[in-house]
Amino acid sequence: MLASYASDPLKSRGRLYKEIPTYYRNEFERDRDRIIHTNAFRRLQYKTQVFINHEGDHYRNRLTHSLEVSTVARSVANTLNLSSDLAETIALAHDLGHTPFGHAGERALNECMKEYHGFSHNSQSLKILTLLEKRYAAYNGVNLTWEVLEGIVKHNGPILGAINEYVAEYNKQNDLELSTYASAEAQVASLADDISYISHDLEDSIGAKIIDFDSLAELQYIDNYVFELKAKFKDISPSCLIYEVVRKLIHELITDLLWQTKENLNKEKITNIDEIRNLHYPIVDFTEKTNERINEIKKFLHKRVYESNKMIAISIKCTKIVQGLFKIYMDDINLLPTNWKILIDSNKTYSKARVIADYIAGMTDRFAIQEYNQLCSPNFNNI
């Protein structure tokens, strides 16, 4: 049974374009299915999480990451008597706007777009779901419920500073109340993202031999996990050891999140969803100690993994590809597919840049590499 402060699909604020409900799915389940059927969702399979797609079959990509986030979000929401369907749906959609090559690709595209209001993957997710996906004759986008769109655009909390241009434009026709916190389900999806990525980036980095178990000594509590597991299982293999470490880490993070969130709900005497939105802090949270530990893991990952020599070398290549494609399309829009070229407003520089950014952002890693080799390589075999 849903709590009084949960997002009830029967009380959804609805869709921008009115539709007749279906009797066999609630509104949030319907949104989940629409997201899964988008081209953007399928493309996540070939987009980088940390390691470039072709570097190994077992490394995570944006699709597997999104699925893992959705399972954590669903479990947490269920335990808190929230709408697990809404939490799962927001989790599945949260990375749709990512560029090829992960954060390296986003930084490169943002640099290309600095004269045109920049680029943000969270805002791009909204744009994909409300404009760029073309699946329905009556409207652009996939016409999701207000609650799902709110959760996507407020993935990092209320928007209090500068507002992305597309978000501001869309908000005029469908007010997402940008200055308030999102639903508890959206907050769950956001922290499920943190739980999943820090845990699994550790796992993948060990597998890729960028870090080893000795380096985990920098994280005392993680090192304690390793010590305890080795003491309990004398002949444990390195691959099994990291799986057990990650399993224990995820369990403790979820347990802590549930405890602190219940404490917050009781302390604030929350009775409805509006009280959650208008609160001065996120109702869904970890304890202070666990937040500190999460920040330590993030710093460790930046230092040891994301800023490692191997990852910097990959980042340089990815930056060259994204910026190279942007420049060549800006120089000659005829190199764009016809269905993208016609979106440019009278060859205006700003309109041209935005369309090109949308096109590049939608590319998979392998398509971006292929396109770069074809357009930018001096090798005539690529033509």
Swiss-Prot record:
Q: Name one GO biological process term.
A: dGTP catabolic process
Q: Which UniProt keywords apply?
A: Hydrolase
What SUPFAM superfamilies does this protein's entry cite? HD-domain/PDEase-like
A molecular-function term among this protein's GO annotations: dGTPase activity
What PROSITE patterns does the database record attribute to this sequence? Answer: HD
Entry's Pfam families?
HD (PF01966), HD_assoc (PF13286)
Kindly give the CDD domains that the UniProt entry links to this protein: HDc
State if Transcription regulation is listed as a keyword: no
Q: Where is the HD domain?
A: 62-198
User: What InterPro entries does this protein map onto?
Assistant: dGTPase (IPR006261), dGTPase-like (IPR050135), dNTPase_2 (IPR023023), HD/PDEase_dom (IPR003607), HD_domain (IPR006674), PHydrolase_assoc_dom (IPR026875)
Query: PANTHER family per the record?
Result: DEOXYGUANOSINETRIPHOSPHATE TRIPHOSPHOHYDROLASE-LIKE PROTEIN, DEOXYNUCLEOSIDE TRIPHOSPHATE TRIPHOSPHOHYDROLASE
Task: Tell me its family.
Answer: Belongs to the dGTPase family. Type 2 subfamily.
Query: What protein name is recorded for this chain?
Result: Deoxyguanosinetriphosphate triphosphohydrolase-like protein
Provenance organism: Rickettsia prowazekii (strain Madrid E)
Q: Organism classification, top ranks?
A: Bacteria, Pseudomonadati, Pseudomonadota, Alphaproteobacteria, Rickettsiales
